């Protein structure tokens, strides 16, 4: 989309990140904080901010059509101007409604630069933090909200974590975010992960699953939103 000059080993595609936000039914104005605790270079957070501000995809990049004849150029510029007029100017707030954190300081540095490039840096708060530190108390403290949506793309696959390490990570996250197999009250989860064994490792069955591919890796998007439900 033209805003992401900096990436890490296995970056999430911008279009997929935007899809995850939309499929999670998150709205900036409903008071629910969006948190990505393994944000990498910030793609999910940036796409959420672009959606919240109603920024048209590709608005910040150049296109070959801009070099065409005057007739095409006028139509293109008119469309760009219309998109600019529709963009919402959202007030900066503390804490931010969109939060990203990662254990890797260099990833957070890149995420901040990407957010600046996308023009949404005032809408996103970043921190260096281990995702496994986010127990219910820490989530409330970090977000200052009793409604939180966690959307994240944890490391997995050959380029990131081997199967045993990924399994241990998923298990650790489930211990923090689930209670008796169901999501803790006030929290919703949307996690993209390989379809094999995630729910067993995580410690609870998802309330909804969506099949998708992250690059060449067949995954599911696991949605957890029902609290107080007994584990199957």
Segments the model singles out, each with a brief description of its role:
Residues 134-146:
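Short amphipathic alpha-helix with an adjacent loop that forms part of the alpha/beta core around
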Residues 93-97, 101-110, 158-232:
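Conserved Class I SAM-dependent methyltransferase catalytic core
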Residues 49-53, 114-115, 141, 164-167, ...:
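Short, glycine/charged-enriched secondary-structure capping and boundary segments
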Residues 145-153:
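Short SAM/SAH-binding signature in class I
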Residues 1-5:
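Non-catalytic substrate-recognition/targeting regions of SAM-dependent transferases
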Residues 12-136:
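Conserved S-adenosyl-L-methionine
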Residues 55, 59-86, 144, 156-190:
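SAM-dependent methyltransferase catalytic-core segment centered on the flexible catalytic loop
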